[in-house]
């Protein structure tokens, strides 16, 4: 919240001057991508997605898996760089193909 500082105008009335508000720059966001996987079963991919990214519902995990299956790549989640790297590396450690890229 900006601080207000009273000042006197020439007519004697007090005028409140607001200090400029600070705008926080939003940190860049990254997309975690799942690439099509011809090796693992659809059930394994969905289960792994839900284990690694707890925010995903069963329906979300299925949608990501089907998007990757049908188009070659599915969007798992958009988040800050640290969790994006964690999710990507954890998916890879479980045998899935994943990458991250900056959000547009």
Swiss-Prot record:
Gene3D superfamilies: 3.30.1390.10
Region (Disordered): 1-20
Superkingdom as given in the UniProt entry: Bacteria
SUPFAM superfamilies: ClpS-like
Entries under Pfam families matching the protein: ClpS
GO BP terms: protein catabolic process; proteolysis
Coiled-coil regions listed in the entry: none
InterPro entries: ClpS, ClpS_core, Ribosomal_bL12_C/ClpS-like
NCBIfam families (alphabetical): PRK00033.1-4
Subunit details: Binds to the N-terminal domain of the chaperone ClpA.
Function: Involved in the modulation of the specificity of the ClpAP-mediated ATP-dependent protein degradation.
HAMAP family: ClpS
Family indicated by similarity: Belongs to the ClpS family.
Protein known as: ATP-dependent Clp protease adapter protein ClpS
Species of provenance: Synechococcus sp. (strain CC9902)
High-level lineage: Bacteria, Bacillati, Cyanobacteriota, Cyanophyceae, Synechococcales
């Amino acid at each position: 919240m900006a601080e207000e500082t009273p000042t006197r105008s020439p007519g004697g009335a007090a005028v409140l001057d607001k200090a400029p508000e600070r705008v926080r720059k939003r940190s860049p966001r990254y997309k975690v991508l799942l690439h099509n996987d011809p090796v693992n079963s659809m059930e394994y991919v969905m289960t792994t997605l839900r284990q690694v990214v707890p925010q995903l519902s069963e329906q979300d995990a299925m949608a990501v898996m089907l998007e990757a299956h049908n188009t070659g790549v599915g969007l798992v989640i958009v988040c800050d760089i640290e969790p994006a790297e964690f999710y990507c590396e954890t998916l890879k450690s479980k045998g899935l193909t994943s990458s991250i890229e900056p959000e547009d």
